[in-house]
Swiss-Prot record:
Gene3D superfamilies cross-referenced by the UniProt entry: Ribonuclease Z/Hydroxyacylglutathione hydrolase-like
Protein name: Ribonuclease Z
Coiled-coil portions: none
A Pfam family of this chain: Lactamase_B
GO function terms (MF aspect): 3'-tRNA processing endoribonuclease activity; zinc ion binding
Family of the protein in this entry: Belongs to the RNase Z family.
Required cofactor(s): Zn(2+)
Residues annotated for Zn(2+) 1 binding in this entry: H63, H65, H142, D213
Phylogenetic placement of the source organism: Bacteria, Bacillati, Bacillota, Bacilli, Lactobacillales
């Protein structure tokens, strides 16, 4: 599991940062990529990476401001040009209006896609769940309807303890598969063994939270609780003047992000959606200020890739 930042700026593109889009790379977990927001020129950014549009199976849109959605029609069209077909459908989760926006752009430009799109209007709570992941949405406080997302990976089953099976003189073969599935098996010699006795501890799944435009609110902490990574907007810095600007424009400061990361017991905080004025020394100052409140903080740049490892068992690390 990895995060790849395709755009880390706010409002409009700059020389150093494109507008918002983040890829959650789930190639090992489900051979797929999920996009969170698709700002203008996201498809151009993708061309500079190893990402393949056909691998994108889900798109999550936080809100309908242009710097978060203007790249959608172009990306969808290019995905079609690159050969996506009816066996590679795409689901777009977003506020009411995202379907109208996409369909209007495609209709007026007479663009016909070679694959189906399913649209899911966001509601509070679980918006997607299967055997590998669950995604939870909650409303934010911005100038228009806006949402945050919590991606929860399901726990991974423990490994089959082969050495323990051998010590118990349990012969290899199909029985191992049954025990791995947690079944109770009767062996040829009459012994009855329970698969759960030969399976190691489950590996706890990872949690990633996306808060891309909002002023502070209780739902941010709720979505971020115990997250391995919290990706949080930081349109403004921590000065008193910038705090006033953030409040006026319904955004957050870097201090807001650090505070919620600390209260929510987040492992790593990644700041994105930065104003264009944050370049060079100002970025270093921003990092320095935030790390005084939350040490494990990183300021994302376009094309950064961040690994999200499994948490080590506390007993293992002793």
């Amino acid at each position: 599991m990895q995060l790849e930042f395709l755009g880390t700026g706010s409002g409009q593109p700059s020389k150093f940062r494109n507008v918002t889009s983040i890829a959650l790379r789930l190639l090992d977990e489900r051979n797929a990529v999920w996009l969170f927001d698709v700002g203008e020129a996201t498809q151009h950014q993708i061309l500079k990476t190893t990402l393949r549009p056909r691998k994108v199976e889900k798109i999550f849109i936080t809100h309908l401001h242009g710097d978060h959605i203007f790249g959608l029609p172009g990306f969808l069209s290019s995905r079609s040009f690159q050969g996506a077909d009816k066996n590679e459908p795409l689901t777009i989760y977003g506020p009411k209006g995202v379907k109208e926006f996409v369909q209007t752009a495609l209709r007026i430009s007479e663009t016909r896609l070679s694959y189906p799109i399913e649209y899911v209007d966001l509601t509070e709570g679980v918006i997607f769940e299967d055997h590998t992941f669950q995604v939870v949405a909650a409303p934010m406080r911005h100038r228009i309807e806006t949402w945050g997302f919590r991606v929860i990976e399901k726990d991974h089953p423990g490994e089959l303890l082969v050495d323990k099976l051998k010590q118990g003189n349990i012969p290899s073969g199909p029985v191992y598969g049954q025990l791995k599935a947690g079944k109770t098996v009767t062996l040829p010699d009459g012994r009855i063994v329970n698969g759960h006795d030969f399976i190691g501890k489950a590996q706890k799944g990872r949690i990633v939270t996306f808060i891309l435009d909002t002023r502070p609110n209780d739902n941010v902490e709720w979505l971020a609780k115990n997250a391995d990574v919290l990706v949080h907007e930081s349109t403004y810095g921590s000065s008193e003047e910038e705090a006033k600007m953030a409040k006026a424009h319904a955004h957050s400061t870097s201090a807001n992000a650090a505070s919620v990361a600390r209260r929510a017991h987040v492992n790593k905080l990644v700041l994105t959606h930065l104003s264009a004025r944050y370049i060079g020394p100002m970025v270093k100052e921003l990092i320095h200020d935030v790390r005084r409140n939350f040490a494990n903080t990183y300021v994302a740049r376009d094309f950064d890739i961040i690994d999200i490892p499994f948490k080590k068992d506390s007993n293992e690390s002793k």
